[in-house]
Each structure stands twice: as structure tokens, then as C-alpha cells.
Amino acid sequence: MEEEGLAIDDVQGRADLRRIDIDRVGIKGIRHPVRVRDRSLGEQHTVARFDMAVSLPHHFKGTHMSRFVEIINGHDREIDIASFEAMLAEMMQRLNAEAGRIEMRFPYFLEKRAPVTGVRSLMDYEVALIGEVSVATTTTWLGVTVPVTSLCPCSKAISERGAHNQRSHVTTAVRMRDFVWIEELIEWVEAEASSPIYGLLKRPDEKYVTEYAYDHPRFVEDLVRGVAARLDTEPRIAAYAVEVENFESIHNHSAYALIERDKRTADA
């Protein structure tokens, strides 16, 4: 039996003689319940997946893995940009790190009404908060992946009947000057697609969505440019990345496009 009060050796704090710095070390895939801001309901309860890591100097053998979990458990409150950056700052302080990164991903649900019948259903979207600290600079991104429908303009133009269409994923990540709702990012993307996607459609709705998409054909280039143009005109957005993947219905590959822009640099 160990003597009461006997100090336990801190193995992680021992020296490592190989003199190799580690860029990132931490934990991945830990799930934790969180509350996030909801434009309609005030807040929404969901479950987030956290990846957390810090840099480790060559003279330390290991980091303190348990502290990452303690930090998450200590933030039992609504997560927004400010509280997320506070979590990032706490991680840097408690791990005594010069650089670090937290990535938090969670499903976010919106109630949508079908375009004709008005029947209600839930749609889920993947949202991400990504924060990085390096050389005393903190960078935070808010991202959301929005599924939409895209219909091919070329297929429509050359075909006597119909046109090929498919589901597309539009992933938009932004750095903000002022607060932007998750719902706004979703709405901006859906407005540029051939058609939004719904959780539930009745026959009149399906007819409407089919014809609406046919009247609004979009190449992958059209879709990525349309979203980028909206973000260019939004003063609350400082920088953005828009990524579009069309899961082609007539090919065994996807079509892809990406636009990245730092408006602060472009406006200088």
C-alpha cells in the first residue's frame, strides 16, 4: 500500500532526448452535449464531436491528455464564437502551449415547410467551429455543409425531355466581422442552388421542386460563384471559403469547385 500523500511521478513531464518538436498532439473524436444559438428557438441542444490538439516542444516527453477532457467538461454552457474562443484560450493556458487547434462538429436541425402543402419536417446540416492559435494570433471559422439540388444546364439545353440532376454539398466556411446566424449561411446557399432540399415532400411539393430545379439550372461553377458573390456583398463576412461537390447522377465521379477569398486583403 502506497504511503498517503506520496507524490506520483509525472511521466509526461520528463525530458525527451530526441529533440523533435510535435506540431499537434491531443485527442480526437470525443463527443459531448452542447447548446448552440438558434435563431427561431433561442438555443438548440445537440451533440458535438471535438478534436483538440496543441504543439509540444521537443524537451517534453508528452502532453497532459486528461486536461483536454477537463476543459470540455468545464464548458457546460451555450457555445458561440466568444465561448468557443474562451475554450481555445483555456486550452492554450492549461497546456502551456504556443500553438493549438480545436475543431467542433455537430448536427444542426431546422424545421422547414414544403413549398406547396406547407407540411413540416426537419432538415439536418453539419456545422463546424474551427479555432487555431499560432504566434499569439487566434483564427476562428464557422462552417456549414448544405445539401441542395443542382440541375445541369447543358443536359437541359441538348435534351428534348428532362435533364440530369443530383444532390450537391455546398460547404461554406466564414470568418466574421460581426455575428452571422447559421440559418443565414444556409439560406444564402439554398438561394443559389437549382432547388433546396426538404425532409418531407408530398406529390404537389415534388412536382413544384422538380419544375423549379428545371427552371434554375446550375453548373458547379455557377453554384460556387453564386454563393461567393453573396458573401462578397455581406459586410459581416471578413473571409470565406466555398466548396461545392456535385454527386453526378450520370457519372461515377463528382464535379467539384472551390473559391477562397480574404476580403480584408482584397479591399486593402
Swiss-Prot record:
GO terms for biological process: tetrahydrofolate biosynthetic process. Pathway: Cofactor biosynthesis; 7,8-dihydroneopterin triphosphate biosynthesis; 7,8-dihydroneopterin triphosphate from GTP: step 1/1. It holds the Pfam family GCHY-1. Keywords: Hydrolase. GO terms for molecular function: GTP cyclohydrolase I activity. The record marks C152 as: May be catalytically important. Converts GTP to 7,8-dihydroneopterin triphosphate. Belongs to the GTP cyclohydrolase IV family. HAMAP family: GTP_cyclohydrol_B. This is GTP cyclohydrolase FolE2. It comes from Methylococcus capsulatus (strain ATCC 33009 / NCIMB 11132 / Bath).
